[in-house]
A protein has these predicted regions:
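Residues that cap or flank secondary-structure elements
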Residues: 25, 47-48
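Glycine/Thr-rich beta-alpha phosphate-binding loop at enzyme active sites
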Residues: 1-36, 76, 80-82
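Conserved active-site-proximal phosphate/metal-binding subdomains
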Residues: 29-43, 51-200
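Short beta->alpha connector loops at strand-helix junctions that form conserved
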Residues: 17-18, 48, 71
Length: 200
């Protein structure tokens, strides 16, 4: 449905967000997404769960034209975010990545932390299942935004335990072992992948 909407809107390609992505995640595996979308005639970019050359190779071997990597580059020296966020990614395991609807009303992948709550209150659960779901999502989005701004201001721009659950990350965290420069990350990926082996 959404892929066809993208095509009808004149998109040059499709970002295929799978069920291992950070942030707003999809509901299908990368394999299933490719099978479902590969006959649409547009380049397909795999997004979700790509943190090292192993997952990159797998995505290209399946048939994707490229990949989109988010979590890996959050844990880079150039990324302008909290150092605690980067460290949380490096220290996290795949089992630490959980999905919550509390932030925006739709499933979001975050790093589980102290005080984390996965589900919304019963009231928002009901609203998200009703004809008011779009308004409920807007309220949750605004609430998350103002809450994070409040705690950052309260702590003079520093992180606090109150906003740790806002650390979005995908299941590729288990492949990330240190904070590196974007150049180093790209060089390693490029040197590790033998393109000729993928397409032969």
């Amino acid at each position: 449905h959404f892929a066809k909407k993208g095509i009808d809107s004149g998109g040059d390609g499709l970002i295929c967000v799978n069920n291992r992505a950070g942030g707003h995640l999809g509901s299908h595996s990368m394999e299933d997404m490719y099978k479902e979308l590969n006959d649409l005639g547009l380049p397909l970019i795999c997004a979700g769960g790509i943190g090292s050359e192993i997952e990159l190779y797998k995505a290209l071997k399946i048939g994707f034209d490229g990949v989109q990597m988010g979590t890996r580059f959050v844990a880079s020296t150039e990324c302008n975010t909290l150092e605690d966020y980067k460290t949380a990614i490096v220290n996290a395991s795949e089992e630490d990545i959980v999905s919550t609807t509390r932030l925006t009303g739709v499933p979001v992948s975050v790093i589980k932390s102290e005080g984390f709550r996965k589900d919304n209150t019963w009231l928002f659960k009901k609203l998200l299942e009703s004809r008011f779901k779009h308004k409920a999502r807007m309220i949750l989005n605004l609430s998350s935004l103002f809450r994070s701004k409040y705690y950052l201001k309260k702590n003079n721009g520093k992180n606090s335990k109150k906003i740790q659950s806002l650390y979005s990350a995908g299941k590729s965290v288990h492949t990330i072992h240190k904070i590196e420069s974007a150049t180093s990350i790209m060089q390693h990926l490029g040197q590790s992948i033998n393109i000729s082996n993928i397409y032969n």
